[in-house]
Curated annotation (Swiss-Prot):
Underlying gene: ALDH22A1
GO terms under cellular component: endoplasmic reticulum; extracellular region
EC number: 1.2.1.3
Species lineage: Eukaryota, Viridiplantae, Streptophyta, Embryophyta, Tracheophyta
Signal peptide: 1-30
Family: Belongs to the aldehyde dehydrogenase family.
KW NAD (keyword) present: yes
Domain of life from the UniProt record: Eukaryota
GO terms, molecular function: aldehyde dehydrogenase (NAD+) activity
Annotated NAD(+) binding sites: G276, S277, T278, A279, V280, G281
Site (Transition state stabilizer): N199
Organism this protein belongs to: Arabidopsis thaliana
Official protein name in the record: Aldehyde dehydrogenase 22A1
Amino acid sequence: MPFWWPLIVLAFAYAICKFLLMLIPPNVPSIDVDASDVLAHGKDTEENSFIYIPPRGRSQQSDKKVQCYEPATMKYLGYFPALSPTEVEERVTLSRKAQKTWAQSSFKLRRQFLRILLKYIIEHQELICEVSSRDTGKTMVDASLGEIMTTCEKITWLLSEGERWLKPESRSSGRAMLHKVSRVEFHPLGVIGAIVPWNYPFHNIFNPMLAAVFSGNGIVIKVSEHASWSGCFYFRIIQAALAAVGAPENLVDVITGFAETGEALVSSVDKMIFVGSTAVGKMIMRNAAETLTPVTLELGGKDAFIICEDADVSHVAQVAVRGTLQSSGQNCAGAERFYVHKDIYTAFIGQVTKIVKSVSAGPPLTGRYDMGAICLQEHSEHLQSLVNDALDKGAEIAVRGSFGHLGEDAVDQYFPPTVLINVNHNMKIMKEEAFGPIMPIMQFSTDEEVIKLANDSRYALGCAVFSGSKHRAKQIASQIQCGVAAINDFASNYMCQSLPFGGVKDSGFGRFAGIEGLRACCLVKSVVEDRFWPLIKTKIPKPIQYPVAENAFEFQEALVETLYGLNIWDRLRSLIDVLKFLTDQSSNVSRTRKSH
């Protein structure tokens, strides 16, 4: 006992010191970011008065300018240049030059960059959310959940664990190489390209940027033409934080444009990250194949939401509605297929109907609305076509939410929260990605049936399984083909930033987030060196030195069994043979050569 007391005292003292150090706030400088232009309500300035503004929608875009509007009100926000391929290549070249300097930076400096960003985000949550709301139509609460919390979680994870997972990692050397030390090193790739969507403009920029910059890379991000206004403001935050730590200019860049701009980016960088539709993802792959550029594709989703009869119906109903209506249903990992056990089917529909009836949609910054606008005007027509197809094939509308006061020019930007019942897999709503506030509910009888239904999709991003038995929920989830699974919850995986995120099938491949996503930004290099240099070096055994001996293959046979044989006695017997070969070889070689 006396032997352990000093160790216990030291451990206790260490814990106390660590706790006291936590009470000392880190020295993190503040940054100033000009937000005067994004706080104005709409742009009716003389500068932009000559531009034709279509009465509705964003489909009429100039080839040379990216025109920006508020989806919720259709107020004009301004325009940004659509970069040419030559301009894109110039931006990548500048980032590549800056990256060579940044690759030598310390993790201490990189962590300070993250802390500066985190401090600014926490202190300017309302500004960041309002900008996102204006550019995408989502509510402030939806922006806080999807933009602020997810980004802060990623920064916090990188601060606490990022360096650990980028340091050289020791690996076992195996039986044949016991005299060697093996490790894996993680080096920056160079310049990473990212093409990101409009649904969460703040997080979609910060997510790849944080991983790329922390791992020593430069990054050029093409923002969506439907969220360029917010993307260019968020870029100012990154620029200010980089300048505060003395990072080289142009390390990070945000570019605007259309397909031509994105294609040029794919052919210019060392790795591509694409988040978007399956159709565009296939185009990215084809273009990347020309230069053998590695790609990570996070594409569409049609997540299954499974509710067993032993689940808490009232609790699950709240989660289900949030999973459907968050950001007006415009989520990559969105709940799009609901499978409810027949014994609780009616009860679940009743609970969901009650909640959805209380939901109102409207311009998020003009009143207290639960749900905002649809970002793309033409998408409302697509959503209605999915509903009509289901109704034509026997489905029914259980309930639809209500609208607040909508401006005439923005009426097509909204779609009511809709619950469909009596649906089946013959309907498009259960097969095509909706990306909207529609909840189609289908009943099932057995676990085997619901697993088959959940896997009957070309998409395979995520799933959620609810059951009073955790074991049962885990058993069901383990048999569903997808990259992300939540037990008795929905989409909680994304708030666990140590976890990789991505899917299979038409939902893409590769992973971002977590250890796997961080290391995906790296050149993964295997390194082997002598363990006892210079005392023990690798030496070619005499039997297989050139010119090889007559019994070289017999030597190899004995060596293989010595190293890998399953029976210890056979291995020892073979070891004796190996030693004989090594000691007798010189005379054997001599006799062999003389005979010729």
